[in-house]
Swiss-Prot record:
One of its GO terms (cellular component) is NSL complex. It comes from the Eukaryota. This is KAT8 regulatory NSL complex subunit 3. Keywords: Chromatin regulator, Cytoplasm, Cytoskeleton, Microtubule, Mitochondrion, Nucleus, Phosphoprotein.
Amino acid sequence: MAHRGGERDFQTSARRMGTSLLFQLSVHERELDLVFLDHSYAKPWSAHPDASSARPTRMLFVTPRRQQENTIESDVPIDVETVTATPVPLYDNQKARSVMNECERHVIFARTDADAPPPPEDWEEHVNRTGWTVAQNKLFNKILKALQSDRLARLANEGACNEPVLRRVAVDKCARRVRQALASVSWDTKLTQWLHTTLVETLSLPMLAAYLDALQTLKGKIPTLIDRMLVSSNTKTGAAGAEALSLLLKRPWDPAVGVLSHNKPSKLPGSPLILIVSSGPSSSVFPASRRHRFWQSQLSCLGKVIPVATHLLNNGSGVGVLQCLEHMIGAVRSKVLEIHSHFPHKPIILIGWNTGALVACHVSVMEYVTAVVCLGFPLLTVDGPRGDVDDPLLDMKTPVLFVIGQNSLQCHPEAMEDFREKIRAENSLVVVGGADDNLRISKAKKKSEGLTQSMVDRCIQDEIVDFLTGVLTRAEGHVGSEPRDQDAEKKKKPRDLTRRDLAFEIPERGSRPASPAARLPTSPSGSEDLSSVSSSPTSSPKTKVTTVTSTQKSSQIGTSQLLKRHVQRTEAVLTHRQAQAQFAAFLKQNMLVRKAFPPGTSSCLFVPISSESVEDIEKEELRVQLKRHHSSSPLPGAKPSKRPKIKVSLISQGDTVGGPCTLSQGGTPEAAGGKPITMTLGASAGAKELTGLLTTAKSSSSEGGGTASTTPSVASSSATPNAIHTLQSRLVATSPGSSLPGTASASSLLQGLSFSLQDISSKTSGLPGSPSPGPAPQATSVKLPTPMQSLGAITTGTSTIVRTIPVATTLSSLGATPGGKPTAIHQLLTNGSLAKLASSLPGLAQISNQASGLKVPTTITLTLRGQPSRITTLSPMGSGATPSEEPNSQMLPSSSQRLPPAP
């Protein structure tokens, strides 16, 4: 079972990693995955709903801890016959030995061409030290001691299976000692040049090869000092010798040169842009190290590499640490914004070492990036470890990969695990065995594992590729689906806008910064304005959210054909929390308003409506509707006009100025004469649907001093009474407009009630020119001590639909100031504007001159304003009860008017 599980894990890892160097290096000691070794129904680590976003830790070259056996055998058998197989090295052994002996071949070639014989083996006894100073003797002895140690290491490692790796470790140790010796004399030019000339002339061939290996290693780290040291010898050896030595010292040899050249990192999907964040202010005096250049060349295989350099004025004189960090963060942010402006659809990856990793994390919190890679993340700070409540890095939403060393002093693996559990973003951790803060493995680790630093860096790069491939694949699939969804939304007509809640689409505070590709405009105008949001042809004038109950679904099909006009919403979109708070205030205020109504009155659903935009909406709708061609003749022979739309907006709260007028106060000359008017419409083909838009008014008797009776509704015989209760399904809430500072209302949300009545049309044979048969009800506004308003009856040919909507108003709510000065609203109520609108409505028989020739509008908007605190009585329809007076109420300045009856 264990063998099968191990083979299956091997095959799965081979398919996942392909031909990566990490797979080749760790194939000998790969830890088995417990999920694969378990039963087939085992679930991964992330299947639990409470699983954190921290992925399991990946270990690189970490020796597994094996438990020591407590039982010690007294007699241990020793096998002296079995031959142990030679382990296969992790690199090309033949090519590694070739580059290893490169300096020895150069020395033999140079000494053979020389005229002088080679130095003997006892060359130290033949060295003439006459005239040497104390500094020269000390320097020469230190260099000689380092070269002798290297010679002993070469002899000890000769013939070993991993001799190239052991030789590389010994050469690095010798180069470090030579550098320390030269630094002891402060790299004095005369001393260093004298030392180099003396060593080249007196050293034996093996010792000279070791010396050139040390110089080759130091040339990659401190090229300027080595070039200054070799100036005098180049003039003596000639141009050919100097060129050969320069080519030899160009780059240090590496046992894994063949593996690195044949195993290049694979290109990441999506062609990302890789930003390398510097760990500090850059300076031309200190160029990048050879290892950083190697990293940059390897990362260039993944995508486009853009180093972000930070330059300080006057070499940073007078600049504090905090200012320097702010300058570094600002430089990276500006580079990210610049790339977003030029390549909005390109993924951006931030990679940083040590302090640069911290800068990259802070930038990811401020700007949108696809992923962050932190190499050598410093978890310990001056104020203690990271991960406190106020740590801004805990709010990261960008996927992040942490790569730390097992022996790191600034970041312990266990402390890093605790920090990862607190991060909300998807994160992963790679622990490099035997590595320090800069991910450099120790010499003991190199010897035991047979590794070099370049091989370890290459394996870390494979882990980075594995992490970024998953992140970019998911991001590419998510971004790639957005244009397809947008195209589908554009091609098909949105059937129901009420399913879309705009409040939930607004990003909450502290969320991840939006992608610049997601912020690109999807409409030709350059931005997705509010008009495009609610552009559904079936949306109601103030559509935002609708909750349809099971009892309302029966009439949904019929009523969906009625609401075909759309009014552009001008209110600002609120956030989700503001919408919740205002909706709670709306419910509270609605209960207060309902308590003021007398029992028995029909329920009114209050819908927020912006008082500032009512007049603009009316003008816009009338302008659009008047452009359409309608027949203005009400004669039977004329063509039937299209279905008009009557919108009644009851503003039951707010003391605003500039709102629309009311029906009962909009008097005409006929109305001033005292003639009652009966609004008569022809028998509508959509009368059944119309009844679905009107709620049934419950009749009740007068109760108390502040109640009144309302006339019950008389429904048409062709209409279904059950459909009358479906008006609530068409009433939807919108964002409320801002109330004025002087308003007397308790909440700015409860500002009005909007009824959309549509599909009122005439028969196909035309509108009737004669009065309707039967007694026509009359809409009468009785002059009462308290201000009140009533909406008249609407008669449709053979049937009558009577709806009484009681709203009590005050003088201030109608636009008149307490001082008695008329305002714009008050003037609009008395100048007969509503009568002019009513005269052009088809089906209102004999309201005004039939031969006026005016175009028939398809929309009439009636808005009644009131203040809930003043509601005391309700106006009856027809002849009825006289409500009681309220002492504190104010009288309207205009006298009550009666609409003339139909002839």
